[in-house]
Amino acid sequence: MDHALFRNLFGGFMNVRTLRSYQLLPSYEVLELPTNIIHAPPPNRFRRKPLQFAARILSSPLLRRALTIAILLPILYVLSGGIPPTYSDIHQFETNLPQHRTSGVDRRYLRFEGTLWGLGLNNILQEQLLLSYIAYASNRSFVFSDYTWSQLPLPYTLYDGALRPTHMPLNTFISAPTAGGDMPSIALTQDVFDEASMSGGPSPHDIRAVHLSHFDSVCPTSARVRLSSAAEERLSDDSLDGAELLNTWVEWLNNASDDPCLVVDFADKPVFNHLLFGSERVISMYPLLASTPILRDFKWSSLVQSAVDRNMEEIEKSADAAADVIPGLVAVHLRRGDYDGHCRYLAKWAIPYQGMNRFPGIVDTLDPEDFDHETESESAQLDHYLRHCLPDITQIVDRLREVRDESPELNLEKVYLLSNGDEWWLNELWEELEKDGWSPVEEGMTSSQDLDITNEEQYISGAIDMAIAEQAEVFIGNGFSSLSGNIIMFRMAKGVPVGSNRLL
């Protein structure tokens, strides 16, 4: 082998010059051997000089290249998914909300701490809607903050091998009263305040929500009155139905303090969590929310709405502007991915449908108590759950056909698939749907995967899907999903008949 090549390849492991420069040993003839010889083991160079040996290993060009590649490959893979946007313009929008410019000496605020984070949008949204209702009913301004996926003090975190924003402004998703939006249903809009200011007349009491940064500026820590959700047992009484629980909270807050800067901490006792939203207790909450601006004035953010308008601009809407539905369209929610394990967990513990998915008037039901555990095997129960939670292609096609046949007067012929499923699976499903007579909502747009969205819109694609599903003549949801439950709630709040909501 060429000497230069040998040195480049193995120079870090062996110094070639040391093989040539060792000293000559003395002749055995001049040595006087000892009478009692102890045979010692040969010296171990690595044991004597481990740091030197390690340094030689690490100085190898080949090893350095391998380490560099090993470090760069995962970084390049993560970066290939793109750098998430900062949404700085929306942060600025929230900072400059007009209600932040008015001092309002009689204004009272309600801030909740220890709330949910690290969960999907719809889990967070369920909680935020209820908390903003409590603030509204208590005649206080709700204090909202960012949607938080991670508490890391960094702009991004890793999720599924890609970068994801740790925080996002709530107004990337919604521009409703919960996120500081106007309340036109009770004439609480910026136009009303501007007119009052110009005329010199009295302004209405402003209870529009404010951002946390504004609350921090007007309510220093020393001025805040702090309460705990664990202060009274009735605040988390499981025997109360949803409406009674909300009324209990409003009554407690009204009696607790008149101070303008009120903070409630959920750290010691979570109340509005998955256990509540998974139960039928939330059904009695709906009329309260629907009668207030919290739902009556709910709307998606301009970022969500612009994506919907761009993707649906060629689609004809119903003549009924109030309902704003797309005639003949069925939107179906097909959750995949982590639901493979989640659905098996639901079957194992016989979990019922989510609360809002059990709303009276939804004809499709699942009652775990209907199972006879003595005569039906665990595999039979699992199969039944999977049919409704994680149906295969044949089961989906059959279910859509059933819904179409049950409502011939609606002329259901178009389908939109809300799904996080793999593209190959969605393509196979669509081939079977076409054979069964279905057409896409728009040419070339069959599912979430076909949406034309920007980098900013990519991280709110679930909300875009929900806004599209709200406009479907019929929605088929997943009974175990909070996303499906929220779609049903928003559809009902818009005046869409409850019977137009079906389940897999």
From Swiss-Prot:
Positions annotated with a glycan in the UniProt record: 139, 255
One GO term (biological process): fucose metabolic process
TM region positions: 66-86
Natural source organism: Strobilurus tenacellus
Main location: membrane
Alphabetical list of InterPro entries matching this protein: GDP-Fuc_O-FucTrfase
Superkingdom in the source lineage: Eukaryota
Role this protein plays: Part of the gene cluster that mediates the biosynthesis of strobilurin A, an antifungal polyketide that contains a key beta-methoxyacrylate toxophore that targets the complex III of the mitochondrial electron transport chain. Strobilurin biosynthesis begins with construction of benzoyl CoA by step-wise elimination of ammonia from phenylalanine by the phenylalanine ammonia-lyase str11, oxygenation by str8 and retro-Claisen reaction to form benzoic acid, which is activated to its CoA thiolester benzoyl CoA by the dedicated CoA ligase str10.
Biotechnology: The structure of strobilurin A was used for the development of the major class of beta-methoxyacrylate agricultural fungicides since its beta-methoxyacrylate toxophore targets the Qo site of complex III of the mitochondrial electron transport chain and prevents adenosine triphosphate synthesis. Compounds such as azoxystrobin (Syngenta) and Kresoxim methyl (BASF) are among the most widely used fungicides worldwide. This class of antifungals are used as effective treatments against a broad range of destructive fungal plant pathogens and make significant contributions to food security.
Pfam families, per database record: O-FucT
GO MF annotation terms: glycosyltransferase activity
Name under which the protein is recorded: Strobilurin A biosynthesis cluster protein l1
This protein's GO CC annotations: membrane
Name of the gene: stl1
Compartment(s) of residence: Membrane
Coiled-coil region(s): none
Annotated CDD domains: O-FucT_like
